[in-house]
Amino acid sequence: MKLADLEIRDLHVSAEDKEILRGIDLDVERGKVHALMGPNGSGKSTLANAIMGHPAFEVTEGTITFKGEDLTEADPDVRSQAGLFMAFQYPVAIPGVSVSKYLRMVINAHREGRGEEAIKIKDFAKVAQEAMELANIPRDFSSRYLNDGFSGGEKKRMELLQLALLRPEIAVLDETDSGLDIDALRTVAEGVNRFAGPEMGVLIITHYQRILHLVKPDFVHVMFEGRIVKEGGPELVGVLEEKGYGWIREEVAASPTGGGV
């Protein structure tokens, strides 16, 4: 039996002394698209932040293992260098730092973690241009300040550019469809479909179904009150679209354990 690349076992996570995740089990492997759904406040973004090691979220029980290595206590940069990536719901703007400069800093941080020399400017220019073409982003994008004055769609394209440049093994997309019009949503979906493949697994976190009409998931996981309570294939998206989350609440309430798949 093939082991998953990212394995989460009995994960309990707290923030500000409040338990948010209450025993998460989840496997994500390269070559597959996973959708993590659930109503607002169910703990989806907390799970994403815990995967990446955000210091505001404390793992109190359980483990996060990536490619056989326990990363539960690892710093965020270690996780990133190992091949994990997260696209944030609300990317931060950094006035005064160009997209090009930021991307070169990110690449060099990864190279330093592998014990390699900093990338030469001409080599960076080549790989950056290739990534921009792959992500369908105009060349003048690189000279703009990072996310400064960017529209919602442009911020998401910036995340796609990082995907194209870094080629992570597992990409966590935290509500990357939030606030996008249909054209921007199509752009994001096209990028995800372009990059997802045998060498990259994707975990799409959303409480909407619309992006999942454009990016077909292999597996769907539904969260409620800090637990994954339902799992299935892409057909589960249609059920949630038709019925909403009310029936999930009813199933959880009727369960002797108050949860469970």
Regions inferred by a protein language model and the residue ranges of each:
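Conserved structural motif at the start of ABC-family nucleotide-binding domains
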Residues: 6-8, 21-23
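The feature captures the beta-strand-to-loop junction immediately N-terminal to the Walker
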Residues: 37-39
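ABC ATPase NBD Q-loop/coupling interface
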Residues: 63-79, 147
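Q-loop/switch helix immediately C-terminal to the Walker
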Residues: 86, 90, 96-112, 124-127
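ABC ATPase C-loop
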Residues: 163-164
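Walker B catalytic motif
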Residues: 175-176, 183
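Conserved beta-strand-loop-alpha-helix hinge in the C-terminal portion
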Residues: 223, 227-250
